[in-house]
Amino acid sequence: MMLGLESLPDPMETWEIIETIGKGTYGKVYKVANKRDGSLAAVKVLDPVSDMDEEIEAEYNILQFLPSHPNVVKFYGMFYKADRCVGGQLWLVLELCNGGSVTELVKGLLRCGKRLDEAVISYILYGALLGLQHLHCHRIIHRDVKGNNILLTTEGGVKLVDFGVSAQLTSTRLRRNTSVGTPFWMAPEVIACEQQYDSSYDARCDVWSLGITAIELGDGDPPLFEMHPVKMLFKIPRNPPPTLLHPDSWCEEFNHFISQCLIKDFEKRPSVTHLLDHPFIKGTQGKVLCLQKQLAKVLQDQKHRNPVAKTRHERMHTGRPHRVEDAGKCCLEDDLVNLEVLDEDTIIYWLQKRYADALIYTYVGDILIALNPFQNLSIYSPQFSRLYHGVKRSSNPPHIFASADNAYQCLVTFSKDQCIVISGESGSGKTESAHLIVQHLTFLGKADNQTLRQKILQVNSLVEAFGNARTAINDNSSRFGKYLEMMFTPTGAVMGARISEYLLEKSRVIQQAAGEKNFHIFYYIYAGLYHQKKLAEFRLPEEKPPRYIAGETERVMQDITSKESYRTQFEAIQHCFKIIGFADKEVHSVYRILAGILNIGSIEFAAISSQHQTDKSEVPNPEALENAACVLCISSEELQEALTSHCVVTRGETIVRANTVDRAEDVRDAMSKALYGRLFSWIVNRINTLLQPDKNICSAEDRMNVGILDIFGFEDFQRNSFEQLCINIANEQIQYYFNQHVFALEQMEYKNEGVDAVLVQYEDNRPLLDMFLQKPLGLLALLDEESRFPQGTDQTLVDKFEDNLRCKFFWRPKGVELCFGIQHYAGPVLYDASGVLEKNRDTLPADVVVVLRTSENKLLQQLFSIPLTKTGNLAQTRAKITASSRSLPPHFSAGRAKVDTLEVIRHPEETTNMKRQTMASYFRYSLMDLLSKMVVGQPHFIRCIKPNDDRKALQFSQDRVLAQLRSTGILETVSIRRQGYSHRIFFEEFVKRYYYLAFRAHQTPPANKESCVAILEKSRLDHWVLGKTKVFLKYYHVEQLNLLLREVMGRVVMLQAYTKGWLGARRYKRAKEKREKGAITIQSAWRGYDARRKLKQRSRRRSESEAHIHTVLQTTPDQKYCPDSGGESNRGHEETSRNCPAEADTDGHPQAQSPPTGCDVTSGHADTAAGYTVAELSVAGTDVSPSLVYHTASAHQRLSPCEDSLKPGSEEGLSQKQRAPRRRCQQPKMLSSPEDTMYYNQLNGTLEYQGSQRKPRKLGQIKVLDGEDQYYKCLSPGACAPEETHSVHPFFFSSSPREDPFAQH
């Protein structure tokens, strides 16, 4: 949120709450008084919850910067009341409108048998239009115009309020595309934005809302107000524009005004400015004051009557879940178990009534019935995902998102795998339902990895492009079984996915029935390559389509290249490959293999005669053979040899035999089926590799799964073959699984636990499954047995069925040789046995395998190098060795393929041995594998119903629906869900789950009946039963218990959060104190170290100086002066000066001292080794001759080894001068030459004169100095001259004016 909450003022300093006015959408509204001037206002108190931040800021910005207008509520400011416990409150202080809303006024009048006068309605609408015009002129769309947002003042003023969802338009964005508002007042174009992402709207959406408000002013409620708000989103776009309930009771202008506001095409809808010129509104403009007084009188009259309860219609927003406050509004017909009368006619009536209202979902207890609407509905947007997130099921209408949410909540709450079983006939909507479940589970399990979520959402689209096709009854029929497992962490975050595929209908690649098509991907890739001008690269023709996709009409090629949907789907498939993580080389290899399959289908064969009268075959169109070989990167000669001949190994000898035309065509088609089947398995395995969970996030033991079964539905065509037999057997197995969980296991536990419950009769299909799957006399076992006989034919197969399958479920029609009938749970089906044996054998010659393993396409090599599993798919273990990387797999590297090829060429019998698995055995193992995955999870059933066979929207065929209800056991399910107990939980598990509801957290209640009773009574549940070891609950009991447990756990989490926050703050405080203490310790240590370092440096420098001084002193006694008359006396004076310091005589003149030795006068400074200067000697009164000074300096220069090399003016000399400052404790140097005496006498005279002219100081300003001060002891009246920078007066050795200090005076 951009608002700085802490910077806002505290409202308690200015405002005082007087009373509660009402309740808004997201907070209460109070009347407040200003503490300073007593003025009244209204305040809307909002909690700063994260999902309202956007609205708060939008409303604040609009109110703050919008200029004032008589028909827009005034804004006094925003305040923030801090509260650490609840997070603080925002106060929006607005103008007080004591008249209430127009909705309250109209309802109050209608309650008294009255209604608003048309003139007053016109006046209210006129004020609202002026307010909207003011907003629109400032590029603001209100987007929530309704009666509750039009307030009245006691003087009859009309004010627009509530700008929480208003939109600010800009010069570059004059439209919006967010679906937001209150459903009853939302315009059709606003609702359309949920489903149609290219839709948008402008300010005229407020005109539609105003038209609905006009109806509300007349009738008291908006149209269809009794409906659920979510249902209204279905109705508004489809229904004609609403009108008043009794249009004849109102004037024509009012009806016309409403009709103009409610034009569904907003481009033709008038604007607010145009509506101000409408006759119904224009007649008000000259009567504003009169009508205002009339409205004020009506308000005054209403004030004396009883207040009317306010009706709030919550607005809906894409960014926020919508919750219905009153759960009791849930319609009874939402759940068929609640119906008083339970029979077929009643159930069909309610299903048809709901379907007519576009309510396609209905509950049967905890089972969901979904009717295919055969149209796009706008009920699957993110807004609805938020709507069905962790709420009570009865709070919202039935929805597939509710079933997904139920499975997710059970997963997180009980840490147990879940299984969602979607079943129904072909064309009933199972695949789309699976899409929606994955979409909602991905939303619920939001992970930090956004890429992973996008990958999972793309998986279904990619797999269905390769595994779905158009059939006679379904344009997007699944031609394989798919079990998608979504993996979650213990906290509920999605972390990966895995697909298991079963029984791909490979025979569709080579042949399709009348009115059907091949797999979608062939049309997508052909159209995509055509528009990319790449057909020639993949050796595909541009004029005549390949035989596998040619179809029956001659316009196939034109349809493929001209259909925009095919090209769009191809681009979508490319996007899926990229998002999921396929490498570009992998995708290119996939395209080459698909193109190779299409080219193989175009190869033709012709018979040729030979000398030995043996049928042979040849390829009359070598260009097709060359194209296929080129795309597959194999030799055309080897391919032709593999198609037209085969090798037989007998007693160690290899015999090459020619293939007949029919056998060559079978080999060609078998090669195409094997290529496509193995390519499909590789794509699935590759997806599993790219979506496998990260082991660092969660271990395999802690991982939880939600399985989604989307399997081909029950089929009954005009011609049913081996594929339909396998599909229907699989549906029989799913129906048996449903019966076991819903009926058999439940009633068995009634008997074992001694529970008195009504037993429901149901149709058990176990005998039929035994007829199919038992050994050795089951149908599939007999089929495998006959397939192993080389002389076996389709006729002998049917005879064997008739001889061994003697039961009521099997019959053989008379007059039809190769047919047999099966009485399935969904009805009787007649099967054609032609080609069943060959399809079951699914023979692929070893010569074809060898040729394909020599391909230069590394992916193609891999497809025929990896062995097949018992379910007929490529083994994942081998793929992990070569495809463990998430980018480009290593099998694309050079040199690796030849090793695999040579390794597997030695064992071609893996794929060609007659003892290998048949299609029936693959099918049997596939069912076993599928059931082993399903039984580990808690099941959730979704029964899809096909309302008609014509695939027309909103057309309901009672006979077709009733037949499906009977076959799936829905009627019996309603009875057992009403009378039975769908949840049976052991005492120990029940107490472990729910003991928080009745016991304290530290308590450990025993797992017995008493504890269970305490929990159930504390939860205020009824109609439960206790058995010997289990608690028997209704389907709705578990939901109520889970909601109560979630509330308790929410409070626990809140308490833990506060505690953890307090502990964290305390740890932080202690860590901060410890850190500060450590910093002080470090700083102290550093300061000590630095002080010791500096002291050590000073000590070192002193030591060096002392060493230097000792060196100089050692050379002093050996100094020799030049002969001079005063030499002896000077030495005597030297000794005297060393022994006796200078003392002042009685006259104040210092006594003379002998000059010390070692004074360097040439360097211009006092030698620190001697400790005295020549100037000090002069002050003492000793006459120092120039010759003496000269010879002394000379002697010093000769006898000072440390300065012997220094020359005046050199850098060494300069540094030496700088290193000789006067010591701090040394006495002032004194000069006493005659010239100095004269100079200082003149100076003293000047100072005395200046002192006489200066005003005397006051006594308080005079500083009394101690006569014992050390400075004054050393300083005599004749020695008050400041220290010279030179040791000896310059004229002793130089006459240069620059060096003479007196020359400046």
Swiss-Prot record:
Subcellular location per the Swiss-Prot or TrEMBL entry = Cytoplasm, Cytoskeleton; Cell projection, Stereocilium
Q: Where is this region: Actin-binding?
A: 927-949
Tell whether Repeat is among the UniProt keywords.
yes
Q: What is its EC number?
A: 2.7.11.1
The Myosin motor domain extends over 331-1046
GO cellular component entries:
cytosol; filopodium tip; myosin complex; photoreceptor inner segment; photoreceptor outer segment; stereocilium tip
Q: Where is the Protein kinase domain?
A: 15-281
Q: Which UniProt keywords apply?
A: Actin-binding, ATP-binding, Cell projection, Cytoplasm, Cytoskeleton, Hearing, Kinase, Motor protein, Myosin, Nucleotide-binding, Repeat, Sensory transduction, Serine/threonine-protein kinase, Transferase, Vision
Nucleotide-binding keyword on record:
yes
User: In the record, what terms sit under GO molecular function?
Assistant: actin binding; ATP binding; microfilament motor activity; protein serine kinase activity; protein serine/threonine kinase activity
SUPFAM superfamilies linked to this entry: P-loop containing nucleoside triphosphate hydrolases (SSF52540), Protein kinase-like (PK-like) (SSF56112)
Domain of life, source organism = Eukaryota
The annotated phenotype of a deletion mutant is: MYO3B single knockout mice do not exhibit early hearing impairment whereas mice with a double knockout of MYO3A and MYO3B are profoundly deaf at 1 month of age. Cochlear hair bundles have abnormally long stereocilia and show dynamic shape defects during development.
Task: State the PROSITE patterns in the record.
Answer: IQ (PS50096), MYOSIN_MOTOR (PS51456), PROTEIN_KINASE_ATP (PS00107), PROTEIN_KINASE_DOM (PS50011), PROTEIN_KINASE_ST (PS00108)
> Catalyses which reaction?
L-seryl-[protein] + ATP = O-phospho-L-seryl-[protein] + ADP + H(+); L-threonyl-[protein] + ATP = O-phospho-L-threonyl-[protein] + ADP + H(+)
Q: Where is the IQ domain?
A: 1048-1077, 1075-1104
Q: Name one GO biological process term.
A: cochlea morphogenesis
The similarity annotation says: In the C-terminal section; belongs to the TRAFAC class myosin-kinesin ATPase superfamily. Myosin family. In the N-terminal section; belongs to the protein kinase superfamily. STE Ser/Thr protein kinase family.
* Role of this protein: Probable actin-based motor with a protein kinase activity. Required for normal cochlear hair bundle development and hearing. Plays an important role in the early steps of cochlear hair bundle morphogenesis. Influences the number and lengths of stereocilia to be produced and limits the growth of microvilli within the forming auditory hair bundles thereby contributing to the architecture of the hair bundle, including its staircase pattern. Involved in the elongation of actin in stereocilia tips by transporting the actin regulatory factor ESPN to the plus ends of actin filaments.
Which PANTHER family does the UniProt entry name for this protein?
AGAP011099-PA, MYOSIN-IIIB
Indicate the quaternary assembly: Interacts (via C-terminus) with ESPN. Interacts (via C-terminus) with ESPNL.
**Name of the protein in its database record:** Myosin-IIIb
Q: Per the UniProt entry, what species is this protein from, by scientific name?
A: Mus musculus (Mouse)
Q: Which gene encodes it?
A: Myo3b
